[in-house]
């Protein structure tokens, strides 16, 4: 889903489940996804922040698609999503975001490694196909 949003999707089209058995594990997962996207609604239509990008450095393999970055601002909140589109781990440098904004970003869904300031930007390591979500409070 994040890859679709990265490439321009702004919603999910669903045309029904009248013939599906209930209860079904698929619907539990589907409703979880819909609830998560409901909270993202303001960011889906906000448009990409200009001049924000990610540079990908390989660990063991050259990047194929590399890491995409979704950076959007809605009101006084900022959402940054790093999406590793490759099966391989990559070092990623986030560039173009003001340091004051980056210092306010909080990782969604777990601790672990954050964004570390370097001369070039803010670096972090992403595993293959990993999605890392940050949002300001």
Per-range role (PLM):
Residues 111-117:
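Surface-exposed loop/edge segments in extracytoplasmic proteins
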Residues 1-38:
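Aromatic/acidic polysaccharide-binding cleft in carbohydrate-active enzymes
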Residues 20, 88, 113:
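Surface-exposed, flexible loop/turn segments at secondary-structure boundaries
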Residues 96-111:
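Solvent-exposed beta-hairpin/edge-strand motifs
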Residues 25-74:
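Pol beta-like nucleotidyltransferase catalytic core
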Residues 117-137:
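C-terminal beta-strand-rich structural cap/linker in extracellular carbohydrate-active enzymes
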Residues 12-16, 80-83, 104-107, 135:
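Conserved active-site loop/cleft motifs that coordinate metal ions or position small ligands
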Residues 60-99, 129:
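Carbohydrate-binding surface patches
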């Amino acid at each position: 889903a994040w890859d679709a949003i990265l490439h321009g999707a702004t919603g999910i089209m669903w045309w029904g489940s009248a013939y599906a058995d209930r209860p079904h594990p698929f619907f539990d997962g589907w409703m979880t996804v819909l609830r998560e996207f409901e909270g993202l609604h303001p960011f889906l239509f906000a448009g990409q922040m200009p001049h924000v990008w990610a540079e990908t450095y390989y660990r063991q393999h050259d990047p194929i698609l590399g890491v995409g970055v979704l950076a959007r601002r809605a009101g006084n909140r900022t959402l940054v999503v790093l999406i590793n589109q490759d099966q391989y781990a990559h070092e990623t440098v986030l560039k173009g975001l003001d340091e004051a904004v980056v210092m306010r970003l909080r990782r969604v869904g777990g601790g672990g490694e954050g964004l570390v300031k370097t001369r070039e930007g803010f670096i972090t390591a992403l595993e293959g196909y990993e999605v890392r979500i940050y949002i300001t409070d």
